[in-house]
């Protein structure tokens, strides 16, 4: 699967927000000038059209979860077929991804690192190996580390970092057993208020 290999902080500056490419423990504001676009004329931000605002919001969320355009559009189509609010359904589908849940638990210090753990068969779902990052986790699922991966220093380091963060209320983590339980699908109020999913729906509805 293709992925972005360029400078991560440049994307944060383009979207004018922290996309959590780093561990999230130390602020990146000193390194990342959010008030400036990347490039030679980054200080000259132009006023965006309605379409531009919608596009930037879509790009921000897509990059936050590390999703390529075609897959992101498929998530939108799936969300539009589900009952309820399409925008909220879209966010829930993204949150239910195994790589994202792995990150939320704290096994990976970033979503990219969590995705790599899943791809390398280090993650178990209900004691079964799952190596598909987009796998949809269900309420009640137990996410743990493969026994051959428990001694990986980076997983332990990520867990130590995650203990400094607040664990999402829809996830229960047992740091001693190195496992997490996906208790429920998050409610919209549980997720970031900085995401405006309605702009994304307006963009794709055109």
From Swiss-Prot:
Keywords: Ribonucleoprotein, Ribosomal protein, RNA-binding, rRNA-binding. SMART domains: Ribosomal_S4, S4. The keyword Ribonucleoprotein applies. GO terms for biological process: ribosomal small subunit biogenesis; translation. PROSITE patterns: S4 (PS50889). GO terms for cellular component: small ribosomal subunit. Residues 96-156 form the S4 RNA-binding domain. It comes from the Bacteria. One of its GO terms (molecular function) is structural constituent of ribosome. InterPro entries: Ribosomal_uS4, Ribosomal_uS4_bac-type, Ribosomal_uS4_N, S4_RNA-bd, S4_RNA-bd_sf. NCBIfam families: PRK05327.1, rpsD_bact. Belongs to the universal ribosomal protein uS4 family. HAMAP family: Ribosomal_uS4_B. One of the primary rRNA binding proteins, it binds directly to 16S rRNA where it nucleates assembly of the body of the 30S subunit. With S5 and S12 plays an important role in translational accuracy. Part of the 30S ribosomal subunit. Contacts protein S5. The interaction surface between S4 and S5 is involved in control of translational fidelity. This is Small ribosomal subunit protein uS4. The gene is rpsD.
């Amino acid at each position: 699967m293709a992925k972005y290999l360029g400078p991560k902080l440049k994307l944060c500056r383009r979207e004018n927000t922290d996309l959590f490419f780093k561990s999230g423990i130390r602020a990146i504001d000193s390194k990342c000038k959010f008030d400036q676009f990347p490039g030679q004329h980054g200080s000259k931000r132009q006023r965006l059209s309605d379409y531009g605002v919608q596009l930037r919001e879509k790009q921000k969320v897509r990059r936050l979860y590390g999703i390529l355009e075609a897959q992101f559009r498929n998530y939108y189509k799936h969300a539009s077929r589900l009952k309820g609010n399409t925008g909220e359904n879209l966010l829930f589908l993204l949150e239910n991804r195994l790589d994202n849940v792995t990150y939320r638990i704290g096994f990976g210090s970033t979503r990219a690192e969590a995705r790599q753990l899943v791809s390398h068969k280090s993650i178990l779902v209900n004691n079964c190996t799952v190596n598909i990052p987009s796998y949809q986790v269900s309420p009640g699922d137990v996410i743990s580390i493969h026994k051959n991966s428990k001694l990986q220093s980076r997983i332990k380091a990520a867990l130590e970092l995650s203990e400094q963060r607040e664990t999402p209320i829809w996830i229960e983590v047992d740091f001693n057993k190195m496992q997490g339980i996906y208790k429920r699908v998050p409610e919209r109020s549980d997720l970031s208020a900085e995401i405006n999913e309605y702009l994304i729906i307006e963009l794709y509805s055109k």
